[in-house]
């Protein structure tokens, strides 16, 4: 069978933990609060990643587990109840409280699901309390969002209404633009998960067609199928081609006429080609190595190879759901090494041996590689940037052309 070469490896990994997803989730749902049950290290990570000043009133915090908790000398459940109740008393605007597990809370087997049920009962429905794990022991950082959305699914109302459900966090402006385009295709019943208010949960049922906006929502997709929804398989909306195919998949499911699809999307594709042109000049023929971290690697590789002319040395991904990623896999060049999992030392050896022009990697690896003269791109920046949709193709390409330009300037 032709197509990329699918490989696997395991060993030491270099990734952020799932707590990082709180940074974009708390911006999406301003009436929700994310209470991490973890260590001071967890608190420092979230504070630094979010860039919030210490005097601000952010919508996240950390219930610190100290030495007595970790040694089992204190009742951590009792202390957690006290912290949560004090928080809700001080912040009456909170409507959903997420209790977020961490590596320390999982090591001591702290049962956050029991705490969430107990607090929900005591608060008598005034605040919904849910829990999920943001631990990095077995997961990568984007899976924090998958856990948070999966925790909300039992609370979604049931409905047989014919509707399109966009699943995965997008920047508000990007989502508004995509909804506007779907409206022009006569798809008007559109809901989002996560919603912009945590209490405005979408209904789901046999009439629901799910279109994933992010490739890392495997558990969420499975649970939505269990609720009767149908999950479409499509390339993800990164780059002009992927975004068009993504929208076409939904439009055909809603039986939109091909001529109407073309009339709405073709002008956008023409503009995208103009926006891509200056970046393609920089990227064409350059060799790129994508280390596994965000699970965006396959859609990005497809975009960079097919629309920007880059050569793929290796495409790493933390996990590969072959069913969900089937359309992306089919669009990659024959023989491209796609490596699921990570042995970071072996991958770094392959980076040094292959001498790529650009490496997409985590922040912890970027500086050492830059010191060796290899241009890098932080993978986490791709998660925080508004890169989805045909309109954003030029901005997405610029995220890769910029480090190459900078590297060339420094070299001269």
From Swiss-Prot:
Keyword Oxidoreductase belongs to the record: yes
Gene3D superfamilies (UniProt xref): Nitrogenase molybdenum iron protein domain
Cofactors required: [4Fe-4S] cluster
Catalytic activity, as annotated: chlorophyllide a + oxidized 2[4Fe-4S]-[ferredoxin] + 2 ADP + 2 phosphate = protochlorophyllide a + reduced 2[4Fe-4S]-[ferredoxin] + 2 ATP + 2 H2O
Binding site for [4Fe-4S] cluster: 17, 42, 103
Complex and partners: Protochlorophyllide reductase is composed of three subunits; ChlL, ChlN and ChlB. Forms a heterotetramer of two ChlB and two ChlN subunits.
Protein name: Light-independent protochlorophyllide reductase subunit N
Organism lineage string: Bacteria, Bacillati, Cyanobacteriota, Cyanophyceae, Synechococcales
């Amino acid at each position: 069978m032709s197509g990329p070469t699918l490989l696997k490896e395991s060993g030491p990994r270099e990734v952020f933990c799932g707590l990082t997803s709180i940074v974009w989730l708390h911006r999406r749902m301003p009436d929700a609060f994310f209470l991490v049950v973890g260590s001071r290290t967890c608190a420092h990570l979230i504070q630094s990643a979010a860039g919030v000043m210490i005097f601000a009133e952010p919508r996240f915090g950390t219930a610190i587990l100290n030495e007595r908790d970790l040694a089992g000398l204190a009742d951590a459940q009792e202390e957690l109840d006290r912290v949560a109740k004090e928080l809700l008393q001080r912040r009456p605007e909170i409507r959903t409280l997420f209790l977020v597990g961490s590596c320390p809370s999982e090591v001591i087997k702290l049962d956050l699901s029991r705490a969430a049920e107990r607090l929900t009962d005591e608060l008598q429905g005034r605040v919904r309390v849910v829990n999920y794990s943001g631990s990095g022991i077995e997961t990568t950082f984007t899976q924090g969002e998958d856990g948070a959305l999966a925790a909300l699914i039992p609370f979604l109302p049931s409905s047989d209404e014919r509707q399109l459900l966009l699943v995965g966090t997008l920047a508000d402006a990007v989502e508004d633009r995509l909804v506007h385009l779907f409206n022009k295709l006569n798809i008007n019943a559109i809901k989002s998960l996560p919603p912009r208010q945590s209490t405005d949960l979408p209904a789901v049922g046999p009439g629901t067609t799910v279109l994933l906006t992010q490739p890392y929502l495997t558990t969420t997709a499975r649970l939505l199928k269990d609720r009767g929804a149908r999950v479409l398989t499509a390339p993800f909306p990164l780059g002009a081609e992927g975004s068009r195919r993504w929208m076409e998949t939904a439009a055909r499911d809603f039986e939109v006429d091909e001529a109407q699809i073309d009339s709405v999307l073709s002008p956008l594709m023409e503009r995208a080609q103009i926006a891509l042109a200056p970046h393609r000049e920089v990227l064409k023929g350059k060799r790129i190595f994508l280390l596994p971290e965000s699970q965006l690697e396959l859609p990005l590789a497809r975009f960079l190879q097919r629309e920007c002319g880059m050569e793929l040395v290796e495409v790493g991904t933390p996990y590969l759901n072959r069913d969900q990623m089937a359309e992306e896999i089919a669009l990659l060049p024959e023989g491209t090494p796609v490596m699921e999992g990570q042995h970071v030392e072996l991958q770094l050896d392959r980076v040094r041996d292959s001498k790529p022009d650009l490496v997409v990697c985590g922040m912890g690896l970027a500086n050492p590689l830059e010191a060796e003269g290899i241009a890098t791109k932080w993978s986490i920046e791709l998660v925080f940037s508004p890169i989805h949709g045909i309109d954003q193709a030029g901005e997405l390409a610029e995220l890769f052309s910029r480090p190459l330009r900078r590297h060339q300037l420094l070299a001269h």
